[in-house]
Amino acid sequence: MAYQNFEDLEVWKKGRVLKNEIFETVKSFPSEEKFRLTDQLIRSSRSVTTQIAEGHGRRTFPDRIRFCIIARGSLSETLNHFLDAVD
């Protein structure tokens, strides 16, 4: 399947859904977490889609792969923050 924009990528679309769900979820967090866990969750989830978009804009395949790896790391960071929230 050919695509023109990063918005066409299924992985970016799923990352966007995750990011939006996180934005809704953190609204229920205690106010004392606003600048701690809430901020970390928002930043790491934004990084997932940001890295995918940036990688899409790179010209070389190794650069694209590198940004996918970074996005995966941001996704793992987001999962870790969710686990912290449960604890």
Regions found by a protein language model. Name each.
Residues 1-87:
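Amphipathic alpha-helical assembly/interaction segments
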